[in-house]
Amino acid sequence: MTAPMILTGSGSAAERDARMAHTAMAFVQLFNGGYHVITKVALNVGVNQLVFCVCRDLLALSILAPLAYFRERKIRTPMNKSLLLSFFFLGLAGVFGNQLLFLIGLTYTNPTYAAAIQPSIPVFTFLLAVMMGTERVNLLRIEGQTKVGGTLVCVMGAVFMVVFRGPALLGDKDADFAMNNEISAKGQPEPTGWLVSGFLDLGFEQWHIGVLCLIGNCMCMATFLAIQAPLLKKYPANLSVAALSYFFGTVLMCTTAFFMVKEPLDWKLTQSEVLAVIYAGVIASALNYGLLTWSNKIIGPALVALYNPLQPAASAFLSRIFLGSPIYLGSVVGGFFIILGLYMVTWASFRERKTAVSGIGIAPHGLKTSEPLIFNGTVNRLGQLFSGLPSSSVKSAD
């Protein structure tokens, strides 16, 4: 009889936390839209991508580490090798790979493209959750079929953005080409330039390379969310999770920059680059990752990832105003399919959550945990009571 008691005792608090998490994630995506535009300005000046990432990460770590140490020193669990390995992979995927691939992709595209492909993150997160066993799909029900169909539609939209750009609907296409060519000659660390040259020799265009890197950026972010959610159950200090992830990511970024950045002048930043680093380090890194980790603990990675579609509108609007970036037909069509697939998955998830919550109210001992990652915090705790049991075999055990 404990399930109803848990719901009654903490339901209002869980709902309040969930509302705050949803609001926080909306602001995170708004801040990300501004980050796309501000970073593009820095790339236009010719900042080295690795130098930018190193400065950003060091600034973010200098904020997150003291906050985590003083605020959570009483709730941190003892460290072990398994936790250290998890934090390393979080830093590798969510900080190192995520940031570097995004900047390379943004260099060869524009903020509109960078934001338009972000809605694929929820689908990649869903696929990883299925492979990890934290998300289950029943293909005999309409919800499961819609999830799979929405996943395929979203992936199709992402692929479409890679293979087709089309005419510029708004803005000057030639100006965009000239801007990308100018950027590619400045601020490129040698191995990155060599890698880009290799793709160009294979017949790829610069925008192909850019979109492929942006897809890799989305896959890294999905991996970060999928790994972080179960880790937060074992290590509930969310600020410390963000700080430790940034520690390993910063170590990887600094090590890479040490070997790849050859020119001492690359470490000298202009005023606009310094402002971009401050925004990236304080807002897009420390604040956003802190809010993201806390929200992931409250509402789970699937719902956290579902807020990424807010980025395209904000980024396209801001980049069109401040940068004059063109909007291409490929980004519009591909973005439409990405968002269509996203909301197919969202609708199916909502239906399953509604059914599961209704089942709790009618027969609490028959609770099914088909989607533990997208319940609210209270339902997540209920799901943990039955961890290790298949959902179909959960019975009353008074």
UniProtKB/Swiss-Prot annotation:
Domain of life: Eukaryota
GO MF annotation, one: transmembrane transporter activity
Domain EamA: 32-144, 237-346
Transmembrane found in the keyword field: yes
Sequence intervals crossing the membrane: 27-47, 50-70, 84-104, 113-133, 150-170, 207-227, 241-261, 274-294, 298-318, 321-341
InterPro entries: EamA_dom, WAT1-related
Signal peptide (from-to): none
GO CC annotation terms, alphabetical: Golgi apparatus; membrane
Principal subcellular localization: membrane
UniProt keyword terms in alphabetical order: Membrane, Repeat, Transmembrane, Transmembrane helix
Cell compartments where the protein resides: Membrane
Keyword Ribosomal protein: no
Entry membrane topology: Multi-pass membrane protein
Family, as annotated: Belongs to the drug/metabolite transporter (DMT) superfamily. Plant drug/metabolite exporter (P-DME) (TC 2.A.7.4) family.
The protein, known as: WAT1-related protein At4g19185
